[in-house]
């Protein structure tokens, strides 16, 4: 109960799927370079650079080989998606991001999540939630969006359009020098902003 959902990337659709089925458990949303994917708004239908890359390597048969080695390639993959602030990278930082991927079996989610978009496999589950869940209850929650404008995975204009369709009066914060991983690019700005939002709601 009273969950503050703070989500980024795939956290948005996961948060949307959870909250539309259990809105009584959720108090507020903090979205960062993601979308709940329930607003029905799509400002840019062109594939992002990341999903063009996914399509290229899936069609060439090389995707599993690259994403299956995230234990050693995670930084390179994050740079493709939109990680801008390389000054944050230390050995501890690399160890933290590499640790979840000690072997190829551990990379299955990282391989399958982008393929869910590429093959549009997730759409039915989202639509089922919209049809059977309580979208009005979700829309009544306090929400904020933080969006790095150098995101190469999710078009910022799509994240903003989806958010505004659901939460038209909620704050949208954009950051021209941050990318998809805004929590890594601008933590000194983002953390106080989130604390302030929680205190106000």
Language-model segment annotations:
Residues 168-201:
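Catalytic active-site module of serine/aspartate enzymes centered on a nucleophile-bearing elbow/loop
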Residues 1-6, 10-174, 183:
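Flexible "cap/lid" subdomain of the alpha/beta-hydrolase fold that forms the substrate-access gate
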């Amino acid at each position: 109960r009273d969950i503050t959902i703070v989500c980024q990337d795939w956290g948005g659709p996961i948060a949307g799927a959870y909250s539309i089925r259990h809105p009584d458990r959720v108090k507020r949303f903090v979205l960062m370079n993601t979308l709940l994917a329930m607003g029905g708004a799509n400002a840019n239908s062109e594939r992002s650079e990341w999903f063009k890359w996914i399509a290229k390597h899936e069609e060439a048969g090389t995707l599993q080989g690259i994403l299956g080695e995230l234990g050693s390639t995670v930084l390179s993959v994050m740079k493709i998606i939109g990680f801008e602030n390389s000054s944050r990278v230390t050995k501890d930082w690399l160890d933290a991001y590499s640790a979840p991927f000690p072997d190829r079996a551990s990379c299955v989610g990282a391989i399958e999540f982008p393929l869910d978009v590429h093959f549009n496999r997730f759409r039915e589950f989202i639509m089922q939630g919209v049809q059977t869940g309580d979208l009005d209850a979700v829309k009544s929650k306090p929400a904020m969006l933080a969006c790095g404008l150098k995101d190469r995975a999710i078009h910022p204009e799509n994240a903003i359009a989806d958010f505004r369709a659901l939460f038209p009066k909620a704050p949208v914060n954009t950051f021209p020098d941050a990318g998809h991983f805004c929590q890594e690019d601008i933590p000194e700005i983002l953390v106080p902003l989130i604390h302030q939002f929680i205190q106000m709601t």
